[in-house]
């Protein structure tokens, strides 16, 4: 099925794409990263629950298959288009109104640091309707409240269909509180991001 025309238009005009996931989301993130080319003209931010040494592993795999620049976020990095940013382990990643990232060492949220909620909520304040956020597979509810705040601030919000998620708790939590404007199967997510 072709993606909703309104959703496609919002994707084309968005400045930033937020991707959040935990257990079971690595495969879909890997496929998403392969879709992007330098002409994307968007900032892509991935927040995934991971261990500290995980970046070198995913960086290698993603870099081999991505045509866009990819880097782990450092404090006060400027958000650039045509770049894929990965939230670092053991920090919460904030998006600041100055167009920079901030790293925060406060307590874990949903037993997670980085927390998807923290990043999504900060993006909601800055990017509002210029943002698209997708919440993927995960084994806890991190990201649901952040997705709701994004939706309430005008962002386009998507949850992976729980039937497709390896771990359905994260997208199901977002759907249950009305945070997901769109609920898309995995192939629909790929089609949207390919347009």
Describe these PLM feature segments:
Residues 1-195:
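Conserved acid/base catalytic micro-environments in cytosolic active-site loops
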